C-alpha cells in the first residue's frame, strides 16, 4: 500500500507559506508529514515460508523426533523488525520565499523535482502584493529594520504615485525586450509580444511586467507587482525607491506572492492540509496543467533574430536601479 501511495506522489504542488517560517523548515515539515502518511499505511500481509520443524512423528507412540515441513509467516520485512518502510523522500523547492515573505511556494516530489528546473527555465512571471508605509526609511527596507530617516508625506497623492508606477513599468518593459534578444522590426517579435511570450533568454535582473496601485490611504499603500527574476529584498527596495521618487521615504511592511507561474492562491495548500492525502490530490489536479503550461512555455517559439544593439537611450546593461529611473523622474 505504501508503494502505491508513493507512485502517486511524483509531481508538483503548491503550499501557502506563512510569514515567519523559513522555506527549509517548511520543506522539512512537508517531508515529515508525507513520511508519516506513507508509513502509517497498513503493511502487507507477511509472506509465507517453508521451514522444517523438529517434532514427534504423528501416529507414533515412540518418542522418535523427525523433521516436518511447515508453512510459517516471515517477519523479515515487518516494520517492527526492519524499521519504517520509508525514511527519506526527495522534496524540492521552486522559487523560494524568504522568512518574512508569505504566499505561494511550489514544491516538487520525486520526479517532480525535474519539473522545478523546467519551471525555472521557462522564465514564468509571478504576482505579488506589496504593502508600503510612507514617512520613514530603514537600513533593510523593512518596517522593523533600524530606523535611519523620518520624513513628511503630506504632498504625496495617488496621481503622483500612479505616474511613478507608469514610468517604472515602461522602463522595465524596454528591458524585457532587450534581454529577450528579439529584433523589434520583425513580425515574429510583434506576434510574440501580442501572445505574451516574450521572455528573457538567460538570467537577468528583476524585470517588472506590470505594476499598479490597489489601495492608497497615506501613509499606507498597496501595490500589485507582476515580475520575474526577483527576490523579496528587491521588492522591498522597490518600495524604498518609490518613496524617494515621491520626495519622501517608504518602507515595506508585507510581501505576499499570489501567483507563481500557473500556481495561484486557490491551489495552494494551507498548513492544516500538509498531509499525504491532500498532497496526492493536489499533485493529481495540477499534473495536466503543469504539462500543458510547460510545453507551451518551453516549446520553441517563433524564429527570432538577435539584436546587434539594443538602441535604448539608457545604459545597455539595463536599469541602474530597481526603478530604472533618473532621480526626480515622474514628478
From Swiss-Prot:
It catalyses: a uridine in mRNA = a pseudouridine in mRNA; uridine(55) in tRNA = pseudouridine(55) in tRNA. Residues 296-331 are annotated as: Disordered. PANTHER family: PSEUDOURIDINE SYNTHASE-RELATED, PSEUDOURIDYLATE SYNTHASE TRUB2, MITOCHONDRIAL. One of its GO terms (biological process) is mRNA processing. Forms a regulatory protein-RNA complex, consisting of RCC1L, NGRN, RPUSD3, RPUSD4, TRUB2, FASTKD2 and 16S mt-rRNA. Residues 314-323 have a biased composition (Polar residues). It is found in: Mitochondrion matrix. The active site is at 98 (nucleophile). Keywords: Isomerase, Mitochondrion, mRNA processing, Transit peptide, tRNA processing. Gene3D superfamilies: Pseudouridine synthase. Belongs to the pseudouridine synthase TruB family. Its main location: mitochondrion. Residues 1-10 form a transit peptide. Pfam families: TruB_N (PF01509). This is Pseudouridylate synthase TRUB2, mitochondrial. InterPro entries: PsdUridine_synth_cat_dom_sf (IPR020103), PsdUridine_synth_N (IPR002501), Trub2 (IPR039048). Minor enzyme contributing to the isomerization of uridine to pseudouridine (pseudouridylation) of specific mitochondrial mRNAs (mt-mRNAs) such as COXI and COXIII mt-mRNAs. As a component of a functional protein-RNA module, consisting of RCC1L, NGRN, RPUSD3, RPUSD4, TRUB2, FASTKD2 and 16S mitochondrial ribosomal RNA (16S mt-rRNA), controls 16S mt-rRNA abundance and is required for intra-mitochondrial translation. Also catalyzes pseudouridylation of some tRNAs, including synthesis of pseudouridine(55) from uracil-55, in the psi GC loop of a subset of tRNAs. One of its GO terms (cellular component) is ribonucleoprotein granule. GO terms for molecular function: pseudouridine synthase activity; RNA binding; tRNA pseudouridine(55) synthase activity. Its EC number is 5.4.99.-, 5.4.99.25.
Amino acid at each position: 500500500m505504501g508503494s502505491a501511495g508513493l507512485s502517486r506522489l511524483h509531481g508538483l504542488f503548491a503550499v501557502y507559506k506563512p510569514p515567519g517560517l523559513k522555506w527549509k523548515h517548511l520543506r522539512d515539515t512537508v517531508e515529515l508529514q508525507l513520511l508519516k502518511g506513507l508509513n502509517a499505511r497498513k503493511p502487507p500481509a507477511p509472506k509465507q515460508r517453508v521451514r522444517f520443524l523438529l517434532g514427534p512423528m504423528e501416529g507414533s507412540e515412540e518418542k522418535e523426533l523427525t523433521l516436518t515441513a511447515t508453512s510459517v509467516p516471515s517477519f523479515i520485512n515487518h516494520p517492527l523488525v526492519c524499521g519504517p518502510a520509508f525514511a527519506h523522500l526527495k522534496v524540492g523547492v521552486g522559487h523560494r520565499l524568504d522568512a518574512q515573505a508569505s504566499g505561494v511556494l511550489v514544491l516538487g516530489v520525486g520526479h517532480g523535482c525535474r519539473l522545478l528546473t523546467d519551471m525555472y527555465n521557462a522564465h514564468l512571471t509571478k504576482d505579488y502584493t506589496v504593502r508600503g508605509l510612507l514617512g520613514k526609511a530603514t537600513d533593510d527596507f523593512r518596517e522593523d529594520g533600524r530606523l535611519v530617516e523620518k520624513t513628511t508625506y503630506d504632498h504625496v497623492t495617488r496621481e503622483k504615485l500612479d505616474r511613478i508606477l507608469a514610468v517604472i513599468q515602461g522602463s522595465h518593459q524596454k528591458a524585457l525586450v532587450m534581454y529577450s534578444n528579439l529584433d523589434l522590426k520583425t513580425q515574429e517579435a510583434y506576434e510574440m509580444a501580442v501572445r505574451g511570450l516574450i521572455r528573457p533568454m538567460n538570467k537577468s535582473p528583476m524585470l517588472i511586467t506590470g505594476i499598479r496601485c490597489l489601495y492608497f490611504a497615506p501613509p499606507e499603500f498597496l501595490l500589485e507587482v507582476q515580475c520575474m527574476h526577483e527576490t523579496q529584498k528587491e521588492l522591498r527596495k522597490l518600495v524604498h525607491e518609490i518613496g524617494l521618487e515621491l520626495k519622501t521615504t517608504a518602507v515595506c511592511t508585507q510581501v505576499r506572492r499570489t501567483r507563481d507561474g500557473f500556481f495561484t492562491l486557490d491551489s495552494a495548500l494551507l498548513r492544516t492540509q500538509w498531509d499525504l492525502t491532500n498532497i496526492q490530490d493536489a499533485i493529481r489536479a495540477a499534473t495536466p496543467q503543469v504539462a500543458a503550461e510547460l510545453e507551451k512555455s518551453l516549446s520553441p517559439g517563433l524564429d527570432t533574430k538577435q539584436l546587434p544593439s539594443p538602441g535604448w537611450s539608457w545604459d545597455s546593461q539595463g536599469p541602474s536601479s530597481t526603478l530604472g529611473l533618473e532621480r526626480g523622474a515622474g514628478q
